[in-house]
Design a protein with these regions (language model features):
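Low-complexity, polybasic segments enriched for Lys interleaved with small residues
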Residues: 2-29, 33
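Short, low-complexity N-terminal intrinsically disordered segments enriched in polar/charged residues
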Residues: 29-71
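Conserved aromatic-histidine-acidic binding/catalytic patches
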Residues: 38-41, 88, 154
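A generic "alpha-helical surface" signal
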Residues: 44-48, 91, 98, 157
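A solvent-exposed, acidic/Ser-Thr-rich amphipathic alpha-helical stretch
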Residues: 71-141
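A beta-strand edge to alpha-helix "cap/lid" segment located at domain peripheries
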Residues: 122, 129-197
Protein backbone atom coordinates (compact mmCIF):
# COMPACT_ATOMS: atom_id res chain seq x y z
CA UNK A 1 0.00 0.00 0.00
CA UNK A 2 2.73 2.45 1.01
CA UNK A 3 4.69 1.55 -2.15
CA UNK A 4 1.63 2.37 -4.32
CA UNK A 5 1.25 5.76 -2.65
CA UNK A 6 4.97 6.52 -3.12
CA UNK A 7 4.80 5.48 -6.82
CA UNK A 8 1.72 7.67 -7.38
CA UNK A 9 3.39 10.63 -5.69
CA UNK A 10 6.56 10.10 -7.77
CA UNK A 11 4.52 10.01 -11.02
CA UNK A 12 2.72 13.22 -10.06
CA UNK A 13 6.05 14.88 -9.26
CA UNK A 14 7.52 13.83 -12.63
CA UNK A 15 4.39 15.12 -14.42
CA UNK A 16 4.59 18.45 -12.57
CA UNK A 17 8.28 18.81 -13.48
CA UNK A 18 7.48 18.14 -17.17
CA UNK A 19 4.72 20.80 -17.13
CA UNK A 20 7.06 23.29 -15.43
CA UNK A 21 9.79 22.55 -17.99
CA UNK A 22 7.38 23.23 -20.88
CA UNK A 23 6.26 26.48 -19.25
CA UNK A 24 9.87 27.63 -18.92
CA UNK A 25 10.56 26.72 -22.56
CA UNK A 26 7.63 28.93 -23.63
CA UNK A 27 8.89 31.92 -21.64
CA UNK A 28 10.49 34.71 -23.68
CA UNK A 29 14.27 34.77 -23.80
CA UNK A 30 16.04 36.81 -21.18
CA UNK A 31 16.58 40.33 -22.55
CA UNK A 32 20.09 41.32 -23.55
CA UNK A 33 22.10 43.44 -21.16
CA UNK A 34 21.34 47.13 -21.40
CA UNK A 35 23.75 48.92 -23.74
CA UNK A 36 26.30 51.29 -22.24
CA UNK A 37 25.33 54.94 -21.97
CA UNK A 38 25.76 56.59 -25.36
CA UNK A 39 26.08 53.27 -27.23
CA UNK A 40 23.02 53.97 -29.39
CA UNK A 41 24.24 57.44 -30.33
CA UNK A 42 27.71 56.07 -31.20
CA UNK A 43 26.19 53.29 -33.32
CA UNK A 44 23.96 55.80 -35.11
CA UNK A 45 26.83 58.25 -35.70
CA UNK A 46 29.07 55.49 -37.10
CA UNK A 47 26.32 54.18 -39.39
CA UNK A 48 25.61 57.69 -40.69
CA UNK A 49 29.33 58.18 -41.37
CA UNK A 50 29.52 54.95 -43.41
CA UNK A 51 26.33 55.78 -45.33
CA UNK A 52 27.70 59.25 -46.09
CA UNK A 53 30.95 57.69 -47.33
CA UNK A 54 28.92 55.50 -49.72
CA UNK A 55 26.99 58.55 -50.99
CA UNK A 56 30.23 60.46 -51.55
CA UNK A 57 31.73 57.59 -53.56
CA UNK A 58 28.59 57.08 -55.64
CA UNK A 59 28.48 60.82 -56.35
CA UNK A 60 32.12 60.74 -57.54
CA UNK A 61 33.04 63.41 -54.97
CA UNK A 62 36.49 61.92 -54.67
CA UNK A 63 38.24 64.90 -53.10
CA UNK A 64 35.57 64.92 -50.41
CA UNK A 65 36.20 61.19 -49.92
CA UNK A 66 39.96 61.72 -49.58
CA UNK A 67 39.24 64.48 -47.04
CA UNK A 68 37.47 61.90 -44.84
CA UNK A 69 40.92 60.42 -44.06
CA UNK A 70 43.29 61.63 -41.37
CA UNK A 71 46.61 63.13 -42.51
CA UNK A 72 48.24 59.71 -42.05
CA UNK A 73 45.17 57.72 -43.16
CA UNK A 74 45.49 54.59 -45.30
CA UNK A 75 43.13 52.83 -47.73
CA UNK A 76 44.03 49.14 -48.06
CA UNK A 77 42.58 46.31 -50.12
CA UNK A 78 44.71 43.20 -49.50
CA UNK A 79 45.19 40.59 -52.19
CA UNK A 80 44.94 37.91 -49.51
CA UNK A 81 42.43 38.18 -46.63
CA UNK A 82 44.99 36.49 -44.35
CA UNK A 83 47.34 39.49 -44.65
CA UNK A 84 47.73 41.40 -41.38
CA UNK A 85 49.51 44.56 -42.58
CA UNK A 86 49.85 46.44 -45.84
CA UNK A 87 53.47 47.58 -45.78
CA UNK A 88 55.80 45.76 -48.17
CA UNK A 89 53.41 43.10 -49.47
CA UNK A 90 51.44 42.86 -52.74
CA UNK A 91 48.02 44.50 -52.43
CA UNK A 92 45.23 45.46 -54.79
CA UNK A 93 45.21 48.93 -53.20
CA UNK A 94 47.57 50.33 -50.55
CA UNK A 95 47.33 54.10 -50.63
CA UNK A 96 47.92 57.03 -48.33
CA UNK A 97 46.26 60.40 -49.00
CA UNK A 98 49.02 61.41 -51.41
CA UNK A 99 48.58 58.32 -53.62
CA UNK A 100 44.79 58.66 -53.43
CA UNK A 101 45.12 62.22 -54.75
CA UNK A 102 47.40 61.02 -57.59
CA UNK A 103 44.80 58.36 -58.51
CA UNK A 104 41.96 60.89 -58.52
CA UNK A 105 43.88 63.38 -60.70
CA UNK A 106 44.83 60.63 -63.17
CA UNK A 107 41.23 59.44 -63.52
CA UNK A 108 39.87 62.99 -63.92
CA UNK A 109 42.62 64.19 -66.29
CA UNK A 110 41.09 65.48 -69.56
CA UNK A 111 43.45 63.27 -71.58
CA UNK A 112 42.41 60.06 -69.77
CA UNK A 113 40.27 58.91 -72.72
CA UNK A 114 40.19 55.30 -71.58
CA UNK A 115 38.26 56.40 -68.50
CA UNK A 116 35.45 58.03 -70.49
CA UNK A 117 32.61 57.86 -69.92
CA UNK A 118 33.08 57.61 -66.17
CA UNK A 119 31.39 54.62 -64.55
CA UNK A 120 28.44 54.69 -62.21
CA UNK A 121 28.41 52.91 -58.87
CA UNK A 122 25.88 52.07 -56.20
CA UNK A 123 27.02 51.06 -52.72
CA UNK A 124 24.97 49.28 -50.08
CA UNK A 125 26.48 49.14 -46.58
CA UNK A 126 25.06 47.08 -43.73
CA UNK A 127 25.74 44.79 -40.74
CA UNK A 128 27.54 47.65 -39.00
CA UNK A 129 29.18 46.41 -35.79
CA UNK A 130 31.34 48.45 -33.46
CA UNK A 131 34.11 46.07 -32.51
CA UNK A 132 36.01 48.37 -30.18
CA UNK A 133 35.51 51.82 -28.69
CA UNK A 134 38.35 53.66 -26.95
CA UNK A 135 37.95 56.13 -24.09
CA UNK A 136 38.83 58.98 -26.48
CA UNK A 137 35.93 58.05 -28.79
CA UNK A 138 37.97 56.31 -31.51
CA UNK A 139 36.24 53.20 -32.84
CA UNK A 140 37.00 50.07 -34.87
CA UNK A 141 34.00 49.13 -37.01
CA UNK A 142 33.23 46.08 -39.14
CA UNK A 143 30.57 46.20 -41.84
CA UNK A 144 29.55 44.48 -45.08
CA UNK A 145 29.26 46.11 -48.48
CA UNK A 146 27.97 45.41 -51.95
CA UNK A 147 28.92 47.67 -54.84
CA UNK A 148 27.42 47.53 -58.32
CA UNK A 149 29.46 49.18 -61.07
CA UNK A 150 28.10 50.12 -64.50
CA UNK A 151 30.52 51.06 -67.26
CA UNK A 152 29.73 51.06 -70.98
CA UNK A 153 26.78 48.69 -70.47
CA UNK A 154 28.94 46.27 -68.47
CA UNK A 155 27.77 45.52 -64.94
CA UNK A 156 30.13 44.21 -62.28
CA UNK A 157 29.47 43.37 -58.64
CA UNK A 158 31.91 43.59 -55.76
CA UNK A 159 31.08 42.51 -52.23
CA UNK A 160 32.91 41.93 -49.00
CA UNK A 161 33.81 43.39 -45.65
CA UNK A 162 35.02 46.80 -44.50
CA UNK A 163 37.06 47.35 -41.35
CA UNK A 164 37.30 51.04 -40.47
CA UNK A 165 39.51 52.55 -37.81
CA UNK A 166 37.74 55.83 -37.14
CA UNK A 167 39.26 58.71 -35.20
CA UNK A 168 36.88 61.01 -33.37
CA UNK A 169 37.58 64.69 -34.03
CA UNK A 170 35.80 67.96 -33.25
CA UNK A 171 34.29 67.88 -36.75
CA UNK A 172 33.21 64.23 -36.63
CA UNK A 173 34.88 60.94 -37.49
CA UNK A 174 37.92 60.66 -39.75
CA UNK A 175 39.33 57.47 -41.29
CA UNK A 176 42.66 56.42 -39.82
CA UNK A 177 42.56 53.18 -41.82
CA UNK A 178 40.04 51.51 -44.10
CA UNK A 179 40.56 47.85 -44.93
CA UNK A 180 38.51 46.34 -47.75
CA UNK A 181 38.37 42.54 -47.91
CA UNK A 182 36.65 41.79 -51.20
CA UNK A 183 35.01 38.36 -51.40
CA UNK A 184 35.66 38.17 -55.15
CA UNK A 185 39.13 39.75 -55.06
CA UNK A 186 40.65 36.73 -56.83
CA UNK A 187 38.05 36.64 -59.61
CA UNK A 188 39.00 37.31 -63.24
CA UNK A 189 37.89 40.74 -64.49
CA UNK A 190 38.09 42.30 -67.95
CA UNK A 191 39.59 45.51 -66.57
CA UNK A 192 40.99 46.66 -63.25
CA UNK A 193 39.32 48.77 -60.60
CA UNK A 194 40.06 52.45 -61.12
CA UNK A 195 38.72 53.94 -57.90
CA UNK A 196 37.89 52.95 -54.37
CA UNK A 197 35.29 50.36 -53.48
Amino acid sequence: MAKKIIRKAAKKLVAKKAVAKKAVARMPAKPAAAPKAGAHSTQHAVEQFLYRQAEILDGKHWQEYIDLFTADGVYWMPADPADKHWDGIPSIFAEDKNLMTVRMKRVLHPDAWSQRPLWGTNHVVGNVNIEKESANGDVVVRSRFHMMELRRDNVRHFAGRYVHQLKKTASGYRIKAQRVDMTNAQAAFDYVLQVWV
